[in-house]
Every structure is written in structure tokens, then in C-alpha cells.
Amino acid sequence: MARKVIEEECEDYFLGISDLSNSKQITTEQYASLIAIYPRAISIGITLPPKTNENSLMSNSVVYNETNNQLNTITVYLSTLLEQEGYKALAVPKAGRVNNGIFFSLHRLAAISADLGKIEKNMVVTPEVGPEVNWGTVLTDAPIGVMIK
């Protein structure tokens, strides 16, 4: 049931589910204790709107804040749903700043482990929209199979 709800809630977004315990990514080593508890990652990506020249710095900040809020809402909802079904789940928080160390790396790791993109210039780049995606992540032990949408 959880997987169906996840797919429905994320139908307008990039969505991938990966098994981090089988990931070949080098960065998984630094998260070994977390992955032992939460071996699967649900990666959710929201496409950013096209950039405008007018007030681009301000509009970028507003866009990231809005998408961060959306991602926080979605990931908390999904982690609560998984916990209600008896699984462990952790909504990885979105920070106010885009480049926030550990959580930023976890979002990238989850997205590339789910084959939603590849790393270029230290960013996740998707085939569909390049790097214009903001990522959110839920870590869980729920037995939801790997998927890419």
C-alpha cells in the first residue's frame, strides 16, 4: 500500500527508489551506520522553473525556499505514512541553503543511486532538465522495490 501512495503523491515529480545497501557509490561509506538502519532511499525531485533575468538572485532564493518547503512537506508525509505501517523512516531535511554539507550529499546520493541522473560539476544532472531539479529524500527500511519514474 505504501508504494502506491508514494507513486500517487509523487506523480508530478522525479521519483526513484534505490537500495543503498547495494550501492556502488563511494559516498555510501560515510553513511554506513545510517544505511544499516535505513537501507532504501526514496528520491523525489521537483523541476525548477526557468530562470528569469529580472531579480534572478532573489527569484532563485524564493524558488529554492518554495521547493524546499514542498519537499519537506512531501518527505515528512511519506515518512509518517511508512512509520504508520510499522517501518522505520527518516525524512532527510532540506536546509535553507542549497549547499548544506551532509544532507545535500545524501540527496545527491539517493538521486544518483536511483539512476535519476549523474554527477557533473558536483551536481545531479538529469537527462530531461539537466541540473534544474531540487531533491528531497526519505530513508526507510520498508520493503519497497527499486523503481525509477
Predicted regions and their residues:
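Non-catalytic, usually N-terminal nucleic-acid engagement modules in DNA/RNA processing proteins
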Residues: M1-V63
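Catalytic cores of enzyme domains
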Residues: N60-K149
